UniProtKB/Swiss-Prot annotation:
One Gene Ontology CC term in the entry: nucleoplasm
Domain of life: Eukaryota
Organism in which the protein naturally occurs: Oryza sativa subsp. japonica
Single Gene Ontology MF annotation: N6-methyladenosine-containing RNA reader activity
Compositional bias annotation for Basic and acidic residues: 596-623
Protein name: Zinc finger CCCH domain-containing protein 45
UniProt entry tagged with the keyword Cytoplasm: no
Amino acid sequence: MDDGDLSFDFEGGLDQPPAGGGGGPAPHSSDPGGVGGGGGGGGPGDGGGHGRGRGRGSYRQTVCRHWLRGLCMKGEACGFLHQFDKARMPVCRFFRDFGECREPDCAYKHSYDDVKECNMYKMGFCPNGPNCRYKHVKLPGPPPPVEEVLQKILQIRSFNKFNQHRHNNYNQQGERPQHPQGSGLPNQNSIDNTTTTTAQPAVGQQAQTTNQQPPQQQQQQQQQQQQQQKPNTNDQVQSVPNGSSNQATRIATPLPQGPSRYFIVKSCNRENLEISVQQGIWATQRSNEAKLNEAFESIENVILIFSINRTRNFQGCAKMTSRIGGYIGGGNWKSAHGTAHYGRNFSIQWLKLCELSFQKTHHLRNPYNDNLPVKISRDCQELEPFIGEQLASLLYLEPDSELTAILIAAEAKKEEEKAKGVSADEAADNQDIVLFDDNEEEEEEESEEEEEGNGQESQGRGRGRGMMWPPQMPMLRGVGPMMGGRGFPPNMIGDGFGFGGGFGMPDPFGVPRGFPPFGPRFPGDFARGGPMPGMVFPGRPPQPGGMFPMGLEMMMGPGRGPLMGGLGMGGPGRPNRPVGMAPFMPPPPPPNNRGTKREQRRPGGERGDRYETTSDQGSRGHDATGNSGAEGARSQSGDRYGRSALRDDDSESDEEAAPRRSRKR
């Protein structure tokens, strides 16, 4: 069964147009489903739809766009027609936005004949702009004066204030033919329309009195008002009777005259924008510097429109006043990742500071960025000049933001500095904000002063900051080092401390330390603070407590330093060398076969030999107390080298090693 086989009783009245919108529309408006169910019997139906009362004229008169694609989720509650009708198709979006459609099989409508006229555009301004779904009809003649548009806006507000229906508002406007409705371009006088909405109540009373005057007197008053406004056409705020808005808008600097190029500039946080407003500078990424320099050299004005990330707002615009490359102090920028990666500073002049929402710029698309909305832009994305000018004009429609107070204070400070005769270079550097380089220099100076403040700390040897000082303990025979203890590399003395630039010890276990990873460089580095308990240092007497409550005397004997074999040598102590040690001597000749055989008999391998010599140092040191000075010197030289016990045939023999093996069993 086709739709043509269906017939309803009320279809006969659809073909008959209503006479002047009289009593005919009542039964049709009471049954909204009948219009949609009638299929194509009624034709376009827009002619009779306008006469149907109380806002039901456009109900299901246009085919639903979403239903055509199978995406409408409203079902029966949808106010559009869920039926394919060629005569009731909506206007093609390409034809509406670009004026043409290149699709030959496009099923949408390509004319504005059946589209309603926009009531907001009739009053002089439509906030939807070219994206409005209603028809914008330009009326002949000059645009109406600002006062007339203001009167209409105040009248609409007064009606809404007393909860009157909006359609009554439109009907009363249609009954007053003495006011010429309509306007030229939708952006004409847009600045005045938005700023004058905050007028005082006296203006509303004046508007009501002028409606009661005859048309001739109204025309004379309009001519006088136009003559008064002619010398103030350049000033956008003179027509506003509110003094507060006049004072707030006077701070903003108008856009410069002449050719301009516009760029979107992104800021990762608000702190950088406050620094820029305070100091009049900015810094972008190094990859964008060449683009801005080329624009600065090729055109008179380079306008930067700023936007902070994740705010969905534009915060204002500024003019680029210097080329990137020269030295300009200030900055201390903060990046999103915590480390500054910006380029060099350049000076700017702030023109306007406000908060413009992205929702008010959805109709502006950038041809330089694949015709995407201006809100979708990267850092230093250039705008098409016409689009950039429109976006900058929208910034001036918004009230000044709180950053304007910072800008006023910064400008006042600059004026004071000029009056005092401060040079431009000194004025560019803000004393309240310190650069990163200055902080590093201050830290270096403080560290040098602390090192020079101690008397004997300037004496010492070695390079760098020294090394870590873990706790030392006498090693037993054949055992490995304690966790955190340092080993004995070659050419090192018995305590594992190097005479040269220091031998840094790896610390894979993260043991507790008494000092930072680098130990003291000079003997007096511990004058300002004592080490942790249990820390023992070469060349210093052990302190009781900490690791050993009774001190190291119970292990090493009274008056003896830790791990120091042999007899003490006379002479003053030297930095980084234990007290009682002999001067550094060249190593002895290579070992013989006897030492090699003994190394093979060691159960602990090479690692056990390294630490076994340490235990031998302590045992032989106690045994050598009653020997002569020559034997003590030989044992001392044997203690200073890790493998000297295996190389000296006179100091140790096989007979001496035999009892030790027996004791080991």
